[in-house]
C-alpha cells in the first residue's frame, strides 16, 4: 500500500471536501504519517473516514475531526498550544507542524510512553508530554494561545479558561458520555470569554477530577 497516496486522498476527500481550507492545516495533515500512530495491523485502515482503537479504551480521532479542531484554533504559526489527551500522539504531531511548541497531557502511562516513542520517530521534537490528570491543564507552562481537548467533558474545567491567553482559543467537546457539542471559547479579555457551538461530535470521556469519573468508580 502506498501510504503517501492514501494520505493525499484522505486530505482531498475527507478534509478539503468537507470545508477545511486553512493551508497550514492541510499541509500538516499531508505531512504526518497517520498510519504510524496505530498498530501495524490497522495500517491499511489508518486513512479511512473513522476513528480507530489505540488500546486502553481510547481511540485515534477521525481525520476530519483532527483537521477541523486544528483549524478551529485559528493558528497562524509560532504559537504555544496545549492538548488535553495525548492518546496516540497524532493530534500533537499535526499541531507540531504548525506551532512552535506543543504541550500535551495524558493520564495513561502506557499511551504516554507509546506516543513519545512515535513522536520521536517521526521527528516531532517540539512536543512535550506530561503524565497527569488532564482536567488540571498544565499551569506551569501557561498561558497558551490555543487549547484543544480530545475527550468529551460534562462541563468546561475552569483551569482551561484560566490558562488561556487573552485572544487565545479553547476547542472542547462538552456534553454527556455518549454525545457532545464541540465548542470554541475565545478569551476576549482578562475576565471576558465568548463561546460558540461548532458541531455535534462523539468523543471518549474526559476522565479526571473536573471531568468524568472512571466507569465503575
UniProtKB/Swiss-Prot annotation:
UniProt keyword Transferase present: yes
Q: Can you name a GO cellular component term?
A: cytoplasm
Q: Which sites are catalytic?
A: 61
* Gene Ontology MF terms in the entry: protein-L-isoaspartate (D-aspartate) O-methyltransferase activity
GO annotation, biological process: methylation; protein modification process; protein repair
Instruction: Name where it's found.
Output: Cytoplasm
* Record-listed E.C. numbers: 2.1.1.77
Q: Does the keyword Ribosomal protein apply?
A: no
According to its UniProt record, which reaction does this protein catalyse?
A: [protein]-L-isoaspartate + S-adenosyl-L-methionine = [protein]-L-isoaspartate alpha-methyl ester + S-adenosyl-L-homocysteine
Keywords associated with the record: Cytoplasm, Methyltransferase, S-adenosyl-L-methionine, Transferase
**What is this protein's function per UniProt?**
Catalyzes the methyl esterification of L-isoaspartyl residues in peptides and proteins that result from spontaneous decomposition of normal L-aspartyl and L-asparaginyl residues. It plays a role in the repair and/or degradation of damaged proteins.
Regarding protein family, the annotation reads: Belongs to the methyltransferase superfamily. L-isoaspartyl/D-aspartyl protein methyltransferase family.
The record's annotation in HAMAP family points to: PIMT
Can you name this protein? Protein-L-isoaspartate O-methyltransferase
